[in-house]
């Protein structure tokens, strides 16, 4: 992930609207989704009742799980079709259409922010980080999860520098991230930042037919090899979290 350039928002909308129509958006198993929310609870340290924004909420799976965990959650996504899909699936959850770089929320209106696989969709995430800072209260926390460029599978399949890169199922905007670069962006926005890594998030679906046949092998390796402590920096997902200092 390089710092520079702007997100092509129309391509993001078109891509995810198409996924909403095909109902192929929610790629994680229910157990993997629950594990991500457990990571949010652990890293954010927020109490039940805290107001949390789920940015890049897609069809609202994580927004719903945040609500079930006791938070007052609202989800935002740039895709109107995914928001509509989510409202149908989760009628008791508030989901709205919007741009994470121009959030329709007041200053200091949230205790926490979840960036749902969102940061790696921005060639330059500095404006996104500034908006997260703006809407968080002082002492508020954010947690982001994104594919790790240091993971060999993520690099081979999702990085444009790889000879095996597949454009199927990914947008033109997204790149796997380097943890240090994302941490630096949020640190420069006035956050106290920490980095962790997560394995064991089983996929139920990937868009590429060729890769889909190998999915059980990937899920097995992810749940075994990458759980070893020595493999921590190479786990498939980076967890970036931070506290707004002032």
Name each model feature, range by range.
Residues 59-102:
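Class I SAM-dependent methyltransferase SAM/SAH-binding core
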Residues 157-162, 184, 194-246:
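A C-terminal cap/extension of S-adenosyl-L-methionine-dependent methyltransferases
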Residues 164-181:
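Acceptor-substrate binding/catalytic loop of class I
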């Amino acid at each position: 992930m390089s710092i520079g350039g702007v997100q092509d928002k129309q391509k993001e909308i078109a891509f995810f609207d198409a996924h909403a129509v095909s109902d192929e958006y929610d790629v994680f198993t229910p157990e993997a989704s629950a594990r991500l929310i457990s990571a949010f609870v652990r890293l954010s340290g927020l109490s039940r009742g805290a107001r949390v924004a789920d940015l890049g909420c897609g069809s609202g799976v994580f927004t719903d799980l945040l609500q079930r965990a006791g938070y007052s959650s609202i989800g935002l996504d740039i895709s109107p079709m995914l928001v509509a899909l989510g409202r149908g699936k989760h009628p008791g959850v508030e989901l709205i259409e919007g741009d994470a770089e121009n959030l329709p929320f007041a200053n200091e209106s949230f205790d926490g922010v979840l960036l749902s696989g969102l940061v790696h969709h921005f060639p330059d995430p500095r404006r996104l980080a500034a908006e997260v800072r703006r809407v968080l209260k002082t002492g508020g926390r954010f947690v982001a999860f994104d594919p790790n460029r240091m993971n060999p599978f993520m690099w081979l399949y999702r990085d444009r520098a790889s000879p095996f890169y597949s454009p199927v199922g990914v947008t033109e905007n997204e790149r796997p991230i380097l943890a240090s670069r994302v941490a630096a962006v949020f640190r420069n926005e006035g956050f106290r930042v920490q980095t962790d890594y997560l394995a064991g998030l089983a996929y139920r679906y990937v868009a590429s037919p060729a890769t889909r046949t190998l999915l059980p092998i990937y899920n097995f390796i992810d749940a075994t090899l990458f759980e070893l402590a020595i493999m921590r920096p190479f786990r498939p997902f980076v967890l970036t979290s931070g506290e707004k200092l002032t």
